[in-house]
């Protein structure tokens, strides 16, 4: 392989070297002095306040589990007191091992600068190994202040894992498949959580009216669900302050009722805290005990949402809220319910509501319904965030995303997804009509997401944390010791409702994987079809055409090279704009890109060609908002670049460095090859960087007061002329040139690929948002260039 690469290098010739000099990707000249990410420090009072607020956002789903756990564990009733004790013991130690130890004290630490969820874990891995979803990244992206990653010694475990992941494409593809499975199943949670929470809370109506039909409860639940999803476009900004008090009141209620029932009925239920009763439970009930695990597992539903909703609060605040309020109240609630069920074995179906004293029954019903709505809202919001992350990383069709709050960036609303969730949620609620089958479906979804998180934590601990292998093995053993039995129990209930999340996850997986596959293949086609810069510059300053006044923004996913649509454009039209800017908008595996680091601008070729490249970088949390004028931002970037470029040319330490304004076609190659050794000449001051022909300046960066830059009169005159020329071109008109491509499978492709590309991907592209809408391009300034890509 070495000899082959060497022979290729010798055969490339001077034209290849010229192309590399003229149009290098945004390379090391774009490096900047970074402000390292530092975790914010909070005062004790602020931490307590944030811990209180986290109750309404993070813990609603986990807190409403006592509404339906015991019924799903014993759908056919309870025969023996020991069964209840054994089930309670399982609940206690499941809550201890999974939410408390695994998530609160381990997984929450694996956040991406405060962002949680499956894609946050994946973005961490993408930064520490070259496994990004779309291969248009470059090493300059690593210079972002939010692009933190570790370095490894050559023979360390982390370095070996990194090389193993990067070695073959199929390994990276398998990792992506695992991430998509977890993501799609988490989306299923956004359907099942509102269904089971609202249906369980509404069931309290029937407890006081035994003769009431089950259909009435279902109708009430559907009405609540319709109201909940219909209000999503208003956002939670105005009513969000109510969530924390409601959930706190809920935890106080279930904790107090639990303590009352322990005192009133069987205090001996406390022996369930002895794990020996878990062994006795399985020994006595055999296969029945294993089947009941599917219901017991519902006691930890909402745990994954605890991680997914992490972005709103610091880790320590969530740890305080869970250990001081959530965990003790849940233990009291389940223990009190167990005591009540032992005394009233025939009330297991409605154990929660029947255990409430009559004097506070209806206030408790109102609080339970409100808590169920809050829990559903938190899961729906988490689903929006998951889809936004998937969309940013090229794994979901471009759907409309709406900001619902001017204060909080994370509060979004996705109309198309909202109505899909509503339809599926109503179908599940009205179709099953009871908690048992929905619970079976819910349990299957939850345990799959947890298994995916466990799997992803292994490379996180080795690559990111550099943990000792003994700690990694301990984490895996303790996690799988709980999750594998629960997963096997859920598989036993596939035919009793467990198939629902599998069908939902499969449908979303097909959509996401087909979209990602075709997006990557389309990018690879563009890479292979890109035009050499040497060829473009060989056409001369006029590009062999008439240069008409105006600015042309040519949008492309390529961070280097000239897209094929541009050569197609100049081949079929006799004119091109006086100023051409290749615009690349790309998302990186970071949660956000600061505004002062978002744009990178460089000049391509000699000045009289007036060709530039602008790369706009976004994180998966960033959004293109409607009030952003993308065209204005791009133009300001160009102006800033020209001013800073002129400053660097006039710098006193660069006297023997010059940028020729004009070169003849024949002199371009020799001049650049002669200057190759000086091509990395760079003058930097703080966070401003510049080099000769490959000029890269991060715009919107603050200039330091002690700067030593000075103008020469000639440079000042030149930049004034160019700025004036650029403004005249803007006044003449700006045109946005986008590729209107049709993607088709090659004729020799298999039938599955043809169906995926020619029909599924084509349909999704037809119904999703166009780039012109995403970038807010005025219709009168839009020019589409049609092409067919065969992938």
From Swiss-Prot:
GO BP terms in the entry: potassium ion transport
Sorted UniProt keywords: Glycoprotein, Ion transport, Membrane, Potassium, Potassium transport, Transmembrane, Transmembrane helix, Transport
Assigned GO CC terms: membrane
Name recorded for this polypeptide: Probable potassium transporter 11
Primary localization: membrane
Domain of life, per lineage: Eukaryota
PANTHER family in the record: OSMOTIC STRESS POTASSIUM TRANSPORTER, POTASSIUM TRANSPORTER 10
InterPro entries attached to this UniProt entry: K+_transporter (IPR003855), K_trans_C (IPR053952), K_trans_N (IPR053951)
Lineage: Eukaryota, Viridiplantae, Streptophyta, Embryophyta, Tracheophyta
Residue intervals on the Cytoplasmic side: 1-49, 109-175, 237-238, 311-315, 381-411, 466-468, 518-791
Function: High-affinity potassium transporter.
Localization: Membrane
Membrane topology: Multi-pass membrane protein
Family: Belongs to the HAK/KUP transporter (TC 2.A.72.3) family.
Transmembrane segments: 50-70, 88-108, 176-196, 216-236, 239-259, 290-310, 316-338, 360-380, 412-432, 445-465, 469-489, 497-517
Residue intervals annotated with topology Extracellular: 71-87, 197-215, 260-289, 339-359, 433-444, 490-496
Glycosylation sites: 211, 434
Gene Ontology molecular function terms on file: potassium ion transmembrane transporter activity
UniProt gene name: HAK11
């Amino acid at each position: 392989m070495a000899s082959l690469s060497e022979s290729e290098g010798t055969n490339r010739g001077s034209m290849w070297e010229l192309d590399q000099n003229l149009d290098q990707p945004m390379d090391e000249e774009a490096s900047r002095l970074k402000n390292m990410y530092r975790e914010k420090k909070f005062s004790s009072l602020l931490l307590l306040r944030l811990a209180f607020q986290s109750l309404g956002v993070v813990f609603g789903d986990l807190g409403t589990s006592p509404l339906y756990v015991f019924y799903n564990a014993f759908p056919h009733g309870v025969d023996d007191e020991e069964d209840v004790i054994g089930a309670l013991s399982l609940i206690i130690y499941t809550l201890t091992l999974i939410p408390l130890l695994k998530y609160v004290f381990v997984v929450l630490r694996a956040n991406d600068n405060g962002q949680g969820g499956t894609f946050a874990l994946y973005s961490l891995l993408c930064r520490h190994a070259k496994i990004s979803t779309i291969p248009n990244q470059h090493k300059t992206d690593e210079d972002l202040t939010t692009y933190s990653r570790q370095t490894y010694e050559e023979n360390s475990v982390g370095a070996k894992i990194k090389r193993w992941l990067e070695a073959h494409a199929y390994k990276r593809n398998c990792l992506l498949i695992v991430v998509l499975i977890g993501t799609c199943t988490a989306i299923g949670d956004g359907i099942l959580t509102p269904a089971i929470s609202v249906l369980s809370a509404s069931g309290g109506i029937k407890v006081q009216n035994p003769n009431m039909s089950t259909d009435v409860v279902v109708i009430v639940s559907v009405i609540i669900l319709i109201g909940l999803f219909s209000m999503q476009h208003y956002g939670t900004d105005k009513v969000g302050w109510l969530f924390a008090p409601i959930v706190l009141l809920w935890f106080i209620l279930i904790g107090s009722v639990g303590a009352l029932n322990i005192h009133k009925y069987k205090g001996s239920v406390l022996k369930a805290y002895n794990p020996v009763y878990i062994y006795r439970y399985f020994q006595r009930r055999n296969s029945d005990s294993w089947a009941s695990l599917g219901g017991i597992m519902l006691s930890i539903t909402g745990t994954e949402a605890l991680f997914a909703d992490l972005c709103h609060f610091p880790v320590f605040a969530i740890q305080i809220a869970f250990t001081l309020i959530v965990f003790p109240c849940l233990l009291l609630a389940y223990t009190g319910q167990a005591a009540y069920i032992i005394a009233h074995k025939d009330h297991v179906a409605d154990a929660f509501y029947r255990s409430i004293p009559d004097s506070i029954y209806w206030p408790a019903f109102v609080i339970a319904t409100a808590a169920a709505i809050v829990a559903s809202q938190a899961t729906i919001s988490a689903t929006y965030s998951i889809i936004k992350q998937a969309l940013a990383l090229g794994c979901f069709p471009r759907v409309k995303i709406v900001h619902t709050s001017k204060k909080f960036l994370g509060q979004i609303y996705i109309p198309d997804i909202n109505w899909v969730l509503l339809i599926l949620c109503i179908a599940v609620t009205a179709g099953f009509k009871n908690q048992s089958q929905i619970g079976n479906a819910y349990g299957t979804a939850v345990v799959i997401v947890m298994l995916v998180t466990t799997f992803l934590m292994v490379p996180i601990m080795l690559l990111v944390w550099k943990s000792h292998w003994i700690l990694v093995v301990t984490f895996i053993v303790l996690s799988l010791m709980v999750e594998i039995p629960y997963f096997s129990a859920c598989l036993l209930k596939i035919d009793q409702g467990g198939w629902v999340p599998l069908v939902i996850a499969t449908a979303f997986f097909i959509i996401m994987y087909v979209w990602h596959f075709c997006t990557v293949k389309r990018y690879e086609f563009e890479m292979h079809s890109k035009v050499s810069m040497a060829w473009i510059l060989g056409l001369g300053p006029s590009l062999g055409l008439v240069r008409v006044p105006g600015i042309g923004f040519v949008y492309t996913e390529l961070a280097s090279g000239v897209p094929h649509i541009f050569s197609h454009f100049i081949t079929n039209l006799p004119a091109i704009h006086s100023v051409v800017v290749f615009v690349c908008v790309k998302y990186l595996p970071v949660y956000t890109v600061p505004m002062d680091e978002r744009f990178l601008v460089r000049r391509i070729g000699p000045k009289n060609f007036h060709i530039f490249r602008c790369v706009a970088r976004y994180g998966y949390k960033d959004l293109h908002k409607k009030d952003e004028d993308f065209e204005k931002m791009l133009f300001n970037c160009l102006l800033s670049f020209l001013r800073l470029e002129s400053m660097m040319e006039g710098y006193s330490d660069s006297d023997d460095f010059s940028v020729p304004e004009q070169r003849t076609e024949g002199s371009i190659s020799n001049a650049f090859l002669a200057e190759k050794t000086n091509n990395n000449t760079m003058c930097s001051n703080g966070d401003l960087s510049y080099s000769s022909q490959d000029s890269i300046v991060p715009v919107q960066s603050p200039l330091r007061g002690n700067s030593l830059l000075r103008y020469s009169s000639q440079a000042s005159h030149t930049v004034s002329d160019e700025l004036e020329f650029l403004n005249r071109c803007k006044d003449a008109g700006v045109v946005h040139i986008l590729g209107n491509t049709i993607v088709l499978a090659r004729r020799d492709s298999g039938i599955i690929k043809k169906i995926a590309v020619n029909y599924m991907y084509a349909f999704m592209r037809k119904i999703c948002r166009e780039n012109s809408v995403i970038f807010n391009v005025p219709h009168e300034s839009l020019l589409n260039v049609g092409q067919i890509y065969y992938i």
